[in-house]
């Protein structure tokens, strides 16, 4: 059984991720998502123990629907919200919070089994995050005003990547020019952090390698943004995997589970095995 979205906040919206009103695992009423609700943790532990008694193995998810709120000590004002994608793979504070949750949920000793999840043979795998990627949604992800600092962070990282690869704007311009057409805009300069990434949708965006060279989705810009995304994915997953091993996790570790496109596939190669979401005949109530 996959223990999924245990980190979700209490929600009223139909079809939304939400936890038990009386006993959520994380006690968001304290103004942050960093502490367990005592009854919620007890229910979680009891459920794990009963599954184990029946010979049912456990798939442990880490971040799924975590509600990042101002009380978590975020880098920027306001609440980032629940189920956000991509930004928790870039932002240092969000990564720290993910590691904190991983340590607390995996190293806590279950009073019903006498074991922490890191030592329990009923656990067969730990998954780092749910349906996420550093290139998911590209530069147009989450247009809420309060998320602008997080979008800026991605753009700044991309520009730093371009400077590291090319050194100067002139060399970048040369690399992005084909048959007299340049994909780099006159106003774009990596030293000023103004080079835009690729526009796209929920998955890795598509690109025609023979398409128009000078547009935002040009093959040159696309290739560098995908290389950047692969690098960010692998850096994040390698770091998280090293941290989980330092806690004592012994089972195979999965990176994520909604991989679409060759760049995304390569960006998730650091998992011990692969997962991908496939939904069949799902009822929505």
Question: Predicted segments — roles?
Answer:
Residues 1-241, 246-252, 257-271:
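Active-site mouth of glycoside hydrolases
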């Amino acid at each position: 059984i996959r223990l999924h979205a245990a980190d979700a906040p209490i929600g009223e919206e139909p079809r939304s991720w939400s936890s038990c009103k009386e006993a959520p695992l994380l006690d968001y009423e304290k103004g942050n998502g960093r502490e367990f609700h005592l009854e919620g943790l007890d229910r979680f532990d009891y459920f794990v123990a009963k599954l184990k008694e029946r010979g049912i193995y456990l798939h442990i998810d880490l971040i799924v629907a975590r509600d990042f709120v101002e009380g978590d000590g975020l880098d920027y004002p306001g609440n980032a919200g629940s189920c956000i994608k991509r930004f928790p793979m870039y932002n240092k504070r969000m990564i720290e919070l993910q590691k904190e949750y991983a340590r607390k949920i995996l190293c806590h000793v279950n009073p019903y089994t006498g074991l922490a999840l890191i030592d329990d043979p009923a656990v067969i795998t730990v998954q780092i995050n749910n349906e996420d990627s550093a290139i998911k949604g590209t530069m147009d992800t989450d247009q809420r005003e309060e998320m602008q600092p997080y979008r800026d962070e991605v753009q700044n990282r991309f520009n730093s990547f371009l400077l590291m690869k090319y050194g100067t704007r002139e060399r970048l311009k040369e690399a992005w020019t084909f048959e007299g057409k340049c994909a780099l805009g006159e106003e774009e300069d990596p030293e000023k952090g103004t080079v835009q990434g690729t526009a796209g949708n929920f998955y890795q965006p598509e690109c025609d390698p023979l398409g128009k060279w000078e547009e935002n989705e040009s093959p040159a810009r696309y290739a560098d943004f995908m290389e950047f995304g692969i690098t960010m994915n692998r850096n994040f997953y390698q770091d998280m995997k090293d941290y989980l091993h330092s806690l004592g996790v012994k089972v195979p570790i999965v990176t994520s589970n909604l991989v679409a496109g060759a760049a995304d596939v390569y960006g998730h190669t650091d998992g011990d095995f692969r997962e991908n979401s496939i939904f069949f005949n799902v009822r929505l109530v």
